[in-house]
Amino acid sequence: MFSIQQPLLVFSDLDGTLLDSHSYDWQPTALWLSRLREANVPVILCSSKTSAEMLYLQKTLGLQGLPLIAENGAVIQLAEQWQDIDGFPRIISGISHGEISQVLNTLREKEHFKFTTFDDVDDATIAEWTGLSRSQAALTQLHEASVTLIWRDSDERMAQFTARLNELGLQFMQGARFWHVLDASAGKDQAANWIIATYQQLSGKRPTTLGLGDGPNDAPLLEVMDYAVIVKGLNREGVHLHDEDPTRVWRTQREGPEGWREGLDHFFSAR
């Protein structure tokens, strides 16, 4: 049993979880975001998005100044009050965006894999793909430690591509809409554990953690949470955890931000 009155951290995915996958609406979560803010509970956004995108969303959601996890854990944006921590304002794990881009270009040229990266197109094209405004689409191209792409080849070729990336110290990760290439050592779980440890070091007590996500790339994050909400999503593979004890894990009936609200209602409304 836990409540929002105790030391607590909430980690949340964005697209398909806190945000609607198509409209990007977040209004169903507004009441809970307000309650958590009033209780001084940090809501830590955790996504494949760039830090530039997420800083913009933090302001929209009233979460500015809090830490966030960008690019599937390859980038950690530190909290504003953590200016004494080495690496402030951002910690970047492993291989840089530029280095990954070079690897992908070589694989495409020499082994003829078919894919289109966000670096291959302009912001107008990304806006068309995503439904974002052009100014917001431009933020999606400001990668620091990963590459986002659309796969345009067969499943067999994807397996070969994944194996080649693994040999080179990279991983290939499926998101809600796109695929992502990043350093094999990076992950939402490692980033979350670092943030949890930092809060524990600063407060002297380990906070209870709640995570929310809807896609396969959220599973590592949810595995390291004390409690988890698996938001009903569009991905055919779904989310599967090693420990799905119903006292720890709640699968929502609703999708997107409605499911996010349902998960918070489940764990807190009766407490």
From Swiss-Prot:
Coiled coil: none annotated. GO terms for cellular component: cytosol. It is an enzyme of class 3 (hydrolase). Gene3D superfamilies: HAD superfamily/HAD-like (3.40.50.1000), Putative mannosyl-3-phosphoglycerate phosphatase, domain 2 (3.30.980.20). It catalyses: 2-O-(alpha-D-mannosyl)-3-phosphoglycerate + H2O = (2R)-2-O-(alpha-D-mannosyl)-glycerate + phosphate. Keywords: Cytoplasm, Hydrolase, Magnesium, Metal-binding. Its EC number is 3.1.3.70. CDD domains: HAD_Pase. Its cofactor is Mg(2+). It is found in: Cytoplasm. GO terms for molecular function: magnesium ion binding; mannosyl-3-phosphoglycerate phosphatase activity. InterPro entries: HAD-like_sf (IPR036412), HAD-SF-IIB-MPGP (IPR006381), HAD-SF_hydro_IIB (IPR006379), HAD_sf (IPR023214), MPG_Pase (IPR012815). The active site is at 13 (nucleophile). Mg(2+) binds at residues 13, 15, 214. One of its GO terms (biological process) is mannosylglycerate biosynthetic process. Transmembrane segments: none annotated. Belongs to the HAD-like hydrolase superfamily. MPGP family. This is Mannosyl-3-phosphoglycerate phosphatase. It comes from Shigella sonnei (strain Ss046).
